[in-house]
Every structure is written in structure tokens, then in C-alpha cells.
């Protein structure tokens, strides 16, 4: 079941929370709505579900306009962060509930309901807990029950609002893998809200990054990491170093050093330089690629690489985070050399585009 979100706007009083949002979700795709608090992601999810109504715009399911359709008539499964299980019902009865309240002409008979719930219990690996009550379950088990209950009525679309947000880190990881496997098996269309970047990139086919009621980027997870479409995405997704400098002529100046850009930008003046920790070239010896001296402040081994916090020596005041590969980890106080590879320059929110795809600032002028 495909979803078409067309020119959706939403206001609460004078506050505009969604600004002309358009997004197409193909049938069978799992999409993450990712963003900080206040970005509009949960409001958009609730509009898809029919729990909120847009100020203007349209929602279509497989070409059919459902914009004014009541939530109960959209055939959408919804999973909340805090489970919303019925405390007085067993696990079995919680999962069966949606089937038992269907209109009589659509309601399966008792034997069919039992068979379906039994199958779902096996699918979510909770068959041995069918007679327990929610108070007797762990957080991860409760969320599995909530997912099974949502799937019991065979929804055309599954929507999840921060489904793992209330769980501890290890349980979240296990449930993420399980949800992805379940999606691969059942091939339902799914949209979930999260503020967790790792969760979004691990589970989703496509990540929609939102900020202040706008879509900043909608791409495959690796594309969002490698090719951020805006400054917001660059800063929001993972760790990034920022250096403040100035463009003068065809050179980038930071502190007492300057680097040739290879071209002269139309914009001249203060800029911010961004680069990921793994985009910094680092070496124990000075070279054309890594001419800038730094001193190691912190070294955190991560298995096949070491994450370092280094202090530039004489060319910038703020420390940088970098990644060094190999088994021979540097020690605190050790002197290393870096180059500013794959750098991106921004004047406010506007990227200063180089002639090539990226800048490679290394040897100073």
C-alpha cells in the first residue's frame, strides 16, 4: 500500500508546525521520520493515521484520498511508545482485541481468531507468555505484544511512534533487528518516528530528516550520511567538526594559516568548515596530505580503530575529533599531523560549492 503525502500544512493556532510537506512512500517500504523535538515528525505520523487532521493538503493511500477519512476506516496499525496495552487482559486477549471488535460482517469466528493470535504469538516469540498480564512482562515483551496487536487486523500500513524509546539500549537493538526481519517477511508499508539516528539508519529503507516543519532530506540511509543535502542534516547526523575561518580571494584562512581553494568563490568573508571525524587525514609524520600539528588529548580504542580528541597546535583554538585506524593506538600527549580532507564550506545555511565535489585542504599556502 503506497502513501502519497501532498502539500500537507498543519497549524495549531498561530503556530505552523508543518510547512507544505510532500512525500511519496512506495508500497512495502519502511521509512523513518527522523528529527529533533519540535520538527513535526510525530504530527505528520498522526496525520497519516487520521489521529490529526491537516490544515490543508492531501493524504492518499494507493491513489485513494483518505484525507477526511476517520482513523478507524483507514486500516492503519498504530504502535505507541508506551505500548497502550490493556492491563486487565492477558497477552492473548490484548492481541485478539482488534479482531473481536470488528464489525460483525468482518469479524472472524472464535476458531479463526485463536488461530491467528497463536500464529502472531509464535511470530513475536511470545507463545509461552500467552496467559500472562502486561504487568508481568518486560518492556521489550510489551512492545512485541503491541506490535502483534497492531498486525492482527492485517493493516495496510503500520505506523510506529518512537516504538523503542522507552526501552534500554540492548533491548532496543534486539527489537530493531527483529522489526526489520518482520518487515522483510511480511512486506508491509511502514512509517516510524524516531530521534535516534542509529535506529533510523539501521532499520529504515529511507530516512526522512525533518526540522522545524520541513523535510531537509529524504534518501537512503547511506546517502544521508555521505551526502547531506543541507547544513542541518550535516550537523544533525552524527559527529562533525566545525572550524570557523574566512575566505579571502582564493584562500581559506583559519588562525595564522591559509590554504588554497583552487578557485576563487564569489562569496568572500566568514565561513564555517565542516568535516566528519573519519574524513580527517591523520598521520604520525608530516606530509602534504597531513601538514598540521596536533596533540592527542583523549584516545578511545574502538576495536579496529581509535577515536581521538586532538588539540591543534598553533593553528586553531578548539579541539577536533578524529579517527585513526590500525592497532597501534596513539597515547595521550603524542604529537600527530592532520589534513582537512573532504571539507565542506558554508556561509550560514548556503554551501559554498567548489569546482569539484569537495574541498581537500591540506598544505598551507
Swiss-Prot record:
Keywords: ATP-binding, Cell inner membrane, Cell membrane, Membrane, Nucleotide-binding, Sulfate transport, Translocase, Transport. Its EC number is 7.3.2.3. It is an enzyme of class 7 (translocase). One of its GO terms (molecular function) is ATP binding. It is found in: Cell inner membrane. ATP binds at residues 35-42. Transmembrane segments: none annotated. It comes from the Bacteria. The complex is composed of two ATP-binding proteins (CysA), two transmembrane proteins (CysT and CysW) and a solute-binding protein (CysP). PANTHER family: SPERMIDINE/PUTRESCINE IMPORT ATP-BINDING PROTEIN POTA (PTHR42781), SPERMIDINE_PUTRESCINE IMPORT ATP-BINDING PROTEIN POTA (PTHR42781:SF4). Part of the ABC transporter complex CysAWTP involved in sulfate/thiosulfate import. Responsible for energy coupling to the transport system. NCBIfam families: 3a0106s01, PRK10851.1. Belongs to the ABC transporter superfamily. Sulfate/tungstate importer (TC 3.A.1.6) family. This is Sulfate/thiosulfate import ATP-binding protein CysA. The lineage of its organism: Bacteria, Pseudomonadati, Pseudomonadota, Gammaproteobacteria, Enterobacterales.
Amino acid at each position: 500500500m503506497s502513501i502519497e503525502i501532498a502539500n500537507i500544512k498543519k497549524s495549531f493556532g498561530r503556530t505552523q508546525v508543518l510547512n507544505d510537506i510532500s512525500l511519496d512512500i512506495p508500497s512495502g517500504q519502511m521509512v523513518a521520520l527522523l528529527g529533533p523535538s519540535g520538527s513535526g515528525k510525530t504530527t505528520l505520523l498522526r496525520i497519516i493515521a487520521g489521529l490529526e487532521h491537516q490544515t490543508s493538503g492531501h493524504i492518499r493511500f494507493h491513489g485513494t484520498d483518505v484525507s477526511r477519512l476517520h482513523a478507524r476506516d483507514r486500516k492503519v496499525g498504530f504502535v505507541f511508545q508506551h505500548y497502550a496495552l490493556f492491563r486487565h487482559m492477558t497477552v492473548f486477549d490484548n492481541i485478539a482485541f482488534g479482531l473481536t471488535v470488528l464489525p460483525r460482517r468482518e469479524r472472524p469466528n472464535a476458531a479463526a481468531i485463536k488461530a491467528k493470535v497463536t500464529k502472531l504469538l509464535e511470530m513475536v516469540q511470545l507463545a509461552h507468555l500467552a496467559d500472562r498480564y502486561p504487568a508481568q512482562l518486560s518492556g521489550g515483551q510489551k512492545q512485541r505484544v503491541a506490535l502483534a496487536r497492531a498486525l492482527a487486523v492485517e493493516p495496510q500500513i503500520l505506523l510506529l511512534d518512537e516504538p523503542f524509546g522507552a526501552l534500554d539500549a540492548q533491548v532496543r537493538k534486539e527489537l530493531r533487528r527483529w522489526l526489520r526481519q518482520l518487515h522483510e517477511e511480511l512486506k508491509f508499508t511502514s512509517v516510524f518516528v524516531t530521534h535516534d539516528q542509529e535506529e533510523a539508519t539501521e532499520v529504515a529503507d529511507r530516512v526522512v530528516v525533518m526540522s522545524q516543519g520541513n523535510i531537509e532530506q529524504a534518501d537512503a540511509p547511506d546517502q544521508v550520511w555521505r551526502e547531506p543535502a543541507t547544513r542541518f542534516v550535516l550537523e544533525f547526523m552524527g559527529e562533525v567538526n566545525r572550524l570557523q575561518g574566512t575566505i579571502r580571494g582564493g584562500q581559506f584562512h583559519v588562525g595564522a594559516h591559509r590554504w588554497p581553494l583552487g578557485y576563487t568563490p564569489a562569496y568572500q568573508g566568514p565561513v564555517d568548515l565542516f568535516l566528519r571525524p573519519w574524513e580527517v587525514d591523520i598521520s604520525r609524520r608530516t606530509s602534504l596530505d597531513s601538514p598540521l600539528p596536533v596533540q592527542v588529548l583523549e584516545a578511545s580504542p574502538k576495536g579496529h580503530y581509535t577515536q581521538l580528541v586532538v588539540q591543534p597546535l598553533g593553528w586553531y583554538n578548539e579541539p577536533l575529533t578524529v579517527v585513526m585506524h590500525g592497532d597501534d593506538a596513539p597515547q595521550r600527549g603524542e604529537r600527530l599531523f592532520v589534513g582537512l580532507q573532504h571539507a565542506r564550506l558554508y556561509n550560514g545555511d548556503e554551501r559554498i560549492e567548489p569546482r569539484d565535489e569537495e574541498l581537500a585542504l591540506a598544505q598551507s599556502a
